[in-house]
């Protein structure tokens, strides 16, 4: 059973979003996603300052099993990336909701959050 924190919003493509305040959101992949991928060996993150659109691929997680695109759950500007992942990509496995975050985004349209799933709805999609 995957851990799905109730205070986050989720995309059906297995990204999570956490409000950090002032229209800034942290993004990562869910515990379920990292379990499917297996041990991370590399994470290719978006460039700080780049603009992303909701649903567009903006990063890649490479594991011992596969490479998987990571999609922007909301539109906006990438304002930070988790530099720790360069030397420690395994943080995505060991702490997907905390130290294994991927990037921070300054939302250009916070109403897009309304189309994301809450924990209960996300759990329902992964238990199908």
Curated annotation (Swiss-Prot):
Recorded family membership: Belongs to the GcvH family.
Alphabetical UniProt keywords: Lipoyl
Self-association state and partner proteins as the record states: The glycine cleavage system is composed of four proteins: P, T, L and H.
Pfam annotation, one family: GCV_H
PANTHER family from the UniProt entry: GLYCINE CLEAVAGE SYSTEM H PROTEIN, GLYCINE CLEAVAGE SYSTEM H PROTEIN-RELATED
Co-factor note (free text): Binds 1 lipoyl cofactor covalently.
Keyword Hydrolase: no
Domain Lipoyl-binding: 24-106
Modified residues (N6-lipoyllysine): 65
CDD domains reported for this sequence: GCS_H
Function: The glycine cleavage system catalyzes the degradation of glycine. The H protein shuttles the methylamine group of glycine from the P protein to the T protein.
Native source species: Yersinia enterocolitica serotype O:8 / biotype 1B (strain NCTC 13174 / 8081)
Cofactor(s) in the UniProt record: (R)-lipoate
Gene Ontology process terms (BP): glycine decarboxylation via glycine cleavage system
Lineage of origin: Bacteria, Pseudomonadati, Pseudomonadota, Gammaproteobacteria, Enterobacterales
Stored HAMAP family: GcvH
UniProt xrefs under NCBIfam families: gcvH (TIGR00527), PRK01202.1 (NF002270)
Name assigned to this protein: Glycine cleavage system H protein
GO cellular component: cytosol; glycine cleavage complex
């Amino acid at each position: 059973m995957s851990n799905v924190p109730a205070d986050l919003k989720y995309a059906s493509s297995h990204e999570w979003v956490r409000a950090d305040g002032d229209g800034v959101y942290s993004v990562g992949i869910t515990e379920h996603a990292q379990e499917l991928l297996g041990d991370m060996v590399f994470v290719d993150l978006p460039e700080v300052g780049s603009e992303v659109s909701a649903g567009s691929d903006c990063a890649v997680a490479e594991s011992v099993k596969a490479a998987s695109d990571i999609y922007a759950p909301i539109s906006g500007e990438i304002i930070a990336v988790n530099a720790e992942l360069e030397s420690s990509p395994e943080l995505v496995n060991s702490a997907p909701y905390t130290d294994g975050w991927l990037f921070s985004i300054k939302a250009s349209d916070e109403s897009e959050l309304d189309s994301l799933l809450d924990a209960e709805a996300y759990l329902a999609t992964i238990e199908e």
